[in-house]
C-alpha cells in the first residue's frame, strides 16, 4: 500500500513538473509555425516603405508609387494572413489581437499617407506620420507582451 501511494505521489510530481502547458504549446506553434508564414510579407512591406521614407526620401511621386505599388499591397496581404491566425488559448489570443490591431492601424496609416500625398496636404502627411509611429509603438508593445507571455510559460526565443 505504501509503495502504491509513493508511486502515485512520484507520478503526480513528475506530471506537474513535466505536464503539458497548453499556452506553451500554443506559443511554440505561433512562433515557430504561424508567424514565419506571414513575417516575410511584413518585412518586405516595411522595407519598401523605408526605402522611400526618412533619409531615403527623394520625391513625393517616388514615395507615392512605392507605397501604392509595393508597400501597401504587401502589407494588406500580411494583415489579412495575420488575421487568419487563430491561437488556441485565450492568453495568446489576447496578445495576438494586439498584433492584429497594430497591423490594421499601420495599414490604415499607409493609406492615409497615400491620400495625403495625393492631396499634397502637409498637415495630413504630418498626421499620417504620427499614426504610423503610433502603430509602430503598438507593434513594439505586442512584442513586449509576447516576450512576457513566453517568459511566463517557459518559452525561450532565440
Predicted feature residues:
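Sec-dependent signal peptide cleavage junction
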Residues: 18-25
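Alpha-helical segments in soluble extracytoplasmic regions
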Residues: 26-98, 102, 110, 117, ...
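N-terminal hydrophobic targeting signals that begin at the initiator methionine
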Residues: 1-2
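Sec-dependent N-terminal signal peptides
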Residues: 5-14
Amino acid at each position: 500500500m505504501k509503495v502504491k501511494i509513493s508511486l502515485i505521489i512520484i507520478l503526480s510530481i513528475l506530471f506537474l513538473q513535466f505536464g503539458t502547458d497548453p499556452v506553451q504549446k500554443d506559443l511554440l506553434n505561433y512562433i515557430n509555425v504561424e508567424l514565419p508564414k506571414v513575417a516575410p510579407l511584413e518585412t518586405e512591406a516595411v522595407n519598401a516603405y523605408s526605402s522611400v521614407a526618412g533619409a531615403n526620401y527623394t520625391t513625393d511621386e517616388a514615395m507615392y508609387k512605392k507605397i501604392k505599388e509595393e508597400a501597401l499591397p504587401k502589407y494588406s496581404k500580411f494583415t489579412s494572413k495575420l488575421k487568419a491566425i487563430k491561437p488556441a488559448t485565450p492568453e495568446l489570443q489576447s496578445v495576438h489581437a494586439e498584433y492584429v490591431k497594430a497591423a490594421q492601424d499601420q495599414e490604415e496609416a499607409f493609406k492615409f499617407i497615400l491620400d495625403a500625398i495625393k492631396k499634397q496636404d502637409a498637415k495630413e502627411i504630418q498626421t499620417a506620420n504620427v499614426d504610423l509611429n503610433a502603430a509602430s509603438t503598438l507593434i513594439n508593445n505586442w512584442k513586449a507582451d509576447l516576450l512576457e507571455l513566453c517568459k511566463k510559460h517557459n518559452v525561450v526565443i532565440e
